[in-house]
Amino acid sequence: MILVDRDTRVVVQGITGREGSFHAQRCREYGTRVVGGVTPGKGGTTHEGFPVWNSVAEAARAEGANCALIFVPPPTAADAVMEATDAGIPLIVCITDGIPALDMARAKAYLATRQSRLIGPNCPGLISPGEAKVGIMPGHIHKAGTV
């Protein structure tokens, strides 16, 4: 099953943070359609050429985002997953590690009643070589072809 391709429109939660900013740039350089990011309180600004919104719902409405890439601190990551789900984002990739287990259990139970798919947390993301990467893995180590 191919989960990301050239048509995937990614919104990065935590884009103004160090990791979110760095990896949003790397994803864009790879060819991924990073449509912007979310940092509450910074909506209406831009960060390194990316538009920033206050919520995932705003980003989804404005840009048609269909994938969320999460780089927020562990105490807020489960809420970020649920926010993306509530915004109707079908694919959520959570890179954050160290999320409290009870928070993630709550988020997983919430996801079970919704249509979103979660990759992670504490994962490198995913890639369709030559198409799109959503995560932290270096693109140059992957090659398109059959497995």
Describe these PLM feature segments.
Residues A24, V56, V81-M82:
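Generic hydrophobic/aromatic pocket-lining and core-packing "Φ" positions
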Residues Q25-H47, P121:
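NAD(P)-binding Rossmann-fold cofactor-contacting core
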Residues L126-V147:
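Conserved anion/nucleotide-ligand pocket segment
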Residues D97-I119:
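Rossmann-fold NAD(P)-binding glycine/threonine-rich loop
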Residues T16:
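N-terminal Rossmann NAD(P)H-binding glycine-rich loop of SDR-like oxidoreductase domains
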Residues V12, G36-T39, I92-C94, R117-N122, ...:
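General beta-strand structural signal in soluble alpha/beta enzymes
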Residues A62-G64, F71, P75-G98:
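Rossmann-fold NAD(P) dinucleotide-binding segment
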